[in-house]
């Protein structure tokens, strides 16, 4: 996620987290923010926050922080063209909780501005559903990048 940048206070926040012994038992994620101030961006940010909190599904563009022991216990990243972050967090949250880091991670709006943001979010949700149903990852990757 090369288009994402952390906010100014991220180092201080991460130090507070990693200094606590219990923090290694959780996957951590930042607050997803899109740089441009548009209503549809704020709606998407709210949807991401709700999904992350209630469904325990933060994705890679939220800057996942995972202790190496938890990472390896969960099997690490699978060799997937797409959905590798979803695959990892799904395995982690079967036994462990994902917790919010109260700091922002800013994502460029380029990929979101190329198409209607609502249509893009729906397309992504459909791709995730197909992935969970076992569709071929190569076909899903082609569909994602089309």
Which residue ranges define each predicted feature?
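Short, glycine-/aromatic-enriched active-site segment of Class I SAM-dependent methyltransferases
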Residues: 46-54
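The conserved acidic donor/metal-binding loop of glycosyltransferases
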Residues: 1-5
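Short aromatic/basic micro-patch
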Residues: 65, 82, 99
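Acidic donor-binding loop at a coil-to-helix junction in glycosyltransferase catalytic cores
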Residues: 82-88
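Conserved nucleotide-sugar donor-binding
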Residues: 61-75
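Hydrophobic helical membrane-anchoring modules
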Residues: 90-146
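Conserved donor NDP-sugar-binding/catalytic core segment of glycosyltransferases
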Residues: 8-40
């Amino acid at each position: 996620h090369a288009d994402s940048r952390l906010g100014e206070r991220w180092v201080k926040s991460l130090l507070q987290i990693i200094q606590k012994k219990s923090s290694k038992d959780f996957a951590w994620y930042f607050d997803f923010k899109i740089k441009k101030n548009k209503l549809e961006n704020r709606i998407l940010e709210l949807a991401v926050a709700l999904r992350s909190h209630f469904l325990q599904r933060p994705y890679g563009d939220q800057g996942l922080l995972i202790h190496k022991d938890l990472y390896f216990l969960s099997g690490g990243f699978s060799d997937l063209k797409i959905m590798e972050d979803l695959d990892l967090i799904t395995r982690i949250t079967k036994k462990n909780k994902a917790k919010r880091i109260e700091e922002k991670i800013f994502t460029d709006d380029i990929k979101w501005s190329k198409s209607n943001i609502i249509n893009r979010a729906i397309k992504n949700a459909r791709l995730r559903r197909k992935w969970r149903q076992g569709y071929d990852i190569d076909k899903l990757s082609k569909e994602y990048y089309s």
